[in-house]
Amino acid sequence: MLTSTDFSGLLNQRFFNNFLPIPATNSLAKGMITPSFELTDVTNGRSVTLTDFRRRRPVVLAFTRIFTEKQYCPFCFPHIKALNESYEEFLDRDVELLMITSTDLRQSKTVVKDLGLKMPLLSDPSCNNFRAYQTGQALGAPLPAQFVLNKVGQLRYKHLFSFLDHNASIETLLKAVDRL
């Protein structure tokens, strides 16, 4: 499923840096404190640090796979839309949902506008956080993954991409949140 026939911007440095397949080899174990980061929240125009949420509220990190502002991973596009539609369900549970993409700021702004995103979309064009969370990569972009962290930043649930199970369902993520 192509989300667009516009391939402009696809062959950039990020594409070549992430071209060779590296499987998800996440060594983060349940109960570990996850790596912190500071990224730009394109949706709300502010800087977000993961440690800002520690002791305040749990966090769901949804690493997603977007090639350009017009080309989405066919497995991730429906997941992005479902997460956006369910954003209030996470907020109702006093949980922050942060989506992380490898697109640059310009591309990310277009994604926010075109998809009408309500949830924070954090831009990580260097892919440093994808690497820190060991999500893997293939064919020009990092692979998707989801992580549920409790209030102190400990990993309570993780889902890594596989061809049999691309992304954790909304129901699975909400159940993981409800178990916190």
Segment roles from a protein language model:
Residues M1-L180:
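Chalcogenol-based redox active-site neighborhoods
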